[in-house]
């Protein structure tokens, strides 16, 4: 939701796919909820903020449905991206750029992908917002207070 709100503040038309009902309390009243195929074919930038599923959200099949020159950002789980397919798409120009905060293997990242000139990497800090840290602190206090 926060990614969508920030995109809207920058004037972006934000599309979202949810596999459940629209999130309760979603502040993005102008966010458009669409199918995955609609999102893939219409988006200039695809931001992954989803838990891991049965298969990667970004693979050769989904990349083929995307616009040429798409930008892909993954701040969720490394398993959501087929790294070999993304590297092929970057090399062919199908994907213009990628921002990656997570890897399939954090201990042994795909160095060909990490060193690609069109890839920007961060060390798994996508969830390190002030808001997230406050929530973590509150949860820890709750755990300590209710211990035993």
List each model region and its residues.
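Glycine-rich adenosine-cofactor-binding loop
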Residues: 1-8
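Rossmann-like adenosine-cofactor binding region
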Residues: 20-111
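C-terminal helix-to-coil terminal segments
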Residues: 102-148
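Alpha-helical hinge/cap motifs
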Residues: 1, 77-78, 124
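Residues at the starts of beta-strands that form the adenosine-phosphate
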Residues: 12-13
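The conserved SAM/SAH-binding core of class I Rossmann-like methyltransferase domains
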Residues: 17
